[in-house]
Amino acid sequence: MKRLPLLLLLLAAAAAFANPPFAPNVRVSDDAGGQVINQGESDFAVWRGQYIYSCCNLAERSTVAMIPYAWSTNGGTSFAPNIPFNDPTPGNPWHTDPAIGVDDSGYVHMIVQYSTASLYHYFSRNGGQTWHDTTFVTGSGVDKPWMVVYRNEIYITWQQTSGSLGIWQAKSTNYGRTFTTGRIWTRTGVNALGMDENQNLHLGLVDNWPSGNVYYRKSTDRGVTWSTEILLSNSSYSTGYGDRAPINSITARGQNVFLTWVDSRTGTWDVVACRSTNGGATWSSRFTVNDDTAGGQCKGWAEFDPYGGLHVMWYHTPNWPTNSSSRWSIRYRYSPNGGASFNPSLRISDTTFASPVDFIGEYHVLRSDSQYIYAQWTDGRAVTNNDLYFSKALLSSVGVAQGNDRVPNPVVPKGLLAPTVWAGPVVLKLSPREQPVSLALYDVAGRKVRGLYEGKVVVETEVRLRSSEFHNGLYFLLWRSGQEQEVKKIINFPR
């Protein structure tokens, strides 16, 4: 019976980590400039799986003139000390709404909005440590810009709030040295911009909240012309602590197009979506993505991976209405069929958290490549302020086959079978793999406790241990083979 309180304690500790297959969270921000600041809405880009470039704005952006910029050269295992990016040229200290991308040479492109007075494009050849070229994109009235970088081409869309109102587009075909701009839509609202693998541009719009509509348009000639708008749904949205806009996202792969936004018609926030299976020609009815409708769900973001798997993340809190004591977490769902159905949601954030400020950013994003799904967000686990955090998961571990043909998960045995509670004799089973296998045990601080296996596994192999070989507590088993990876949480009772 004495073990029961300890077991409950350890189970509670185990709950304070991201659900596998997502890796333990890595802090991205470090209060650039030496100030205690609250990181807000963020964007990031991934280059060749190794280089990650991140930017965000601040809750204090009206008084602290900078965009915290961070980068990783090891796939997000760690991030270098942040650079407090600041440009006095626009003459406006309000640095906000940044977006970032990487071109075909690995050079970094970033756009920054200065209040609503102007928008500038920045170009770096050394991963953002210095910025070599600055280009004025547009002037007064700019709000909520989004950017797509493809090879030497850059596409930017934003809401124009003064002058010729509407959704505007800027396009560059020379790496951002010059831009052509023009109005492409007379409607206003929050827009979402995406590009599929065939270089079709997809544009979503939520207008006139608290009560408005959701629209879609498409360009098949790289922004020269745009299709007639399609009305997808009406919308309903009310602001609250932690969220203040029905931010939408759009992603496309093959003939599948998926658009999300935040809706509060049920009395609380939900992440809702419409989907198309014919390239945006026709659309489904609106449906709810989150599988827990209690409390509030907001800041949804969707991303198709290169194999057509669909990934969606959002902020979740069980509390309603939201306030400074609300406990938030980052949730995630995977769909193998373009959003027709979803697996149960997982938690990406290691812990729940409250936000010390109302502004948690209006958007945070997912990115993917041929191996991983990547996530970045801001949270208040530090208690005094909000910081950016990062996590990733192997596509093969969230139900994605490494190729164009889908393979249901049960066909390929898991590489590691292991009990999650160790008390006495322990048997770990390793399944055969073509690539060498490594298995190691780590403590909660990420320190390697012991290597348990290293080498080829031709037939099912057992690794036998006793729980008495290790101290009481929480551990992680890390199994790797080639590009595959599995992480399991272990609670150990020495016997």
Spans of features found by a protein language model:
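A periodicity- and composition-biased signal for non-globular, repetitive helical segments
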Residues: L8-L9, G223-V224, P494
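Short, linear, compositionally biased motifs with a strong N-terminal bias
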Residues: L10-L11, T134, G455
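Extracellular, repeat-based ectodomains that mediate carbohydrate processing or recognition
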Residues: A18-V398
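C-terminal outer-membrane/trafficking sorting elements
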Residues: R406-R495
